[in-house]
Amino acid sequence: MQHRWLAGIAIALAGAWAGVSAASAQSWPSKPVRIVVPVTAGSATDVSARVIADHLAPLLGQPVVVENRTGAGGTTGMGYVAKSVEPDGYTVLVHSAAFVIQPATFPNLGYDSGKDFAGVTLIGNAPLVMIASPNKYKTLQELVTAAKAKPNTVNYATVGYGAAAHLTSERLRLAAGFEAQQIPFRGAPEAVNEVLAQRVDFFFSPTLAAVPLIRDGKLSALAVSSSKRALSLPEVPTTVEAGYPNSDYNFWIGMWVPLKTPRDVVDRLYAETRKVLDMPAVQEKLIALGSEPARMTPAEFDKFFQAEIKLNGDLVKAAGIKPNP
């Protein structure tokens, strides 16, 4: 008799939870949705989030507001979403591939990128182009040959220790087997100017900053870092095509929510975001920012970013990059 009573309670609870789950997707959102961007306003990641927010709001029937929570290399905003908000679908994170770099470069964070977030979707790939002065190098092979002939005489620009340009350069350096010195700068414009002035040998730059100078003949495009050629530079080979296996490094932008966000809410957010990303007007704006269309389901994106966390962790160790304290 007691077993029947317990079984009845279990069935009732299961039904209740199922009802709550179904209701959550139907009622969500009933108030404004906030997209947290952990980098500064005006960056490609920030502008991408704002483009999506503008088109997502009508589909959800609620305002979608972008909030910049910057600091500590993006970890302030990530920590806020991971630990300080309710996992109810009303706070969303949009961030770049820095999301998967930080577990290796900031090991003492109060959150875990791999365990505290659920993926929604990949927003787009953002290839980096390896630029150099045409007075010094016109091909990647020329640069590698020069670097091997005189070890540690070649240098490269980054926009911060452990940032994407740093890891991209190190992945190529390890794959091609040469030595080079890193020189950090405050941002991409400064790094590009140093390459133009021939004080720096190469820099993996966002395509948006480099393409006009490449078209004017002021910079050489030696290769792109991504697995596929960039839409804006279809004539430029990838580093792998240039002859260096396992040298590709993909930079991208994605969307996450706190881990315990109801699955049906995640699925609804993905479905509506997918509609936005499929809009020609949105694709045109994102491509202009250097972000090429890419799509992944939540399950695919979860698998993808977990693999990227491991790849970057292994790369940081292989390159001898010391984590931040």
Question: Where are the regions that the model predicts?
Answer:
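N-terminal secretory signal peptides that target proteins for export/translocation
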Residues: 1-3
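Bacterial N-terminal signal peptides
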Residues: 7-19
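N-terminal (or domain-start) structured segment
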Residues: 24-115, 152-153, 177-206, 213, ...
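An extracytoplasmic/periplasmic, membrane-proximal ligand-sensing/linker region
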Residues: 30-32, 175-176, 241, 263-325
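Hinge/capping helix and adjacent helix->loop/strand transition within the periplasmic-binding protein
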Residues: 83-90, 104-190, 239-241, 252-285
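Short secondary-structure boundary segments
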Residues: 96-97, 134, 207-208, 226-227, ...
